[in-house]
Amino acid sequence: MLAGPAMSQTTPTPDPVLAGYRASIDNIDAALIHILAERFRITKAVGAYKAQTNLPPSDPGREERQIARLRKLAEDANLDPEFSEKFLRFIIEEVIRHHEQAQGTR
């Protein structure tokens, strides 16, 4: 009797080096999520404060300074500054959206 394709396949032996890398990535991903959650807890408080004090939801000057600062940090860390800027702009847009919701302007 001939073995079909499903019969001849075996489960590959896990590569311990790759498994170690993946475990590190999983830990870093978890840390990123917790850090983002903390960041959003703080920006939520900022949004509430801005709503109470009638400050605008966004601060373009602050945002541009943050982007410039993080681009420099990215360069120093050998991380693509373009990627870092896109990532931060995405976060800023979400924060502004939350601030607008806190003020009832969106």
Segments predicted by a language model, with ranges:
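Domain-level signature for soluble enzymes in the chorismate/prephenate branch of the shikimate pathway
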Residues: 2-106
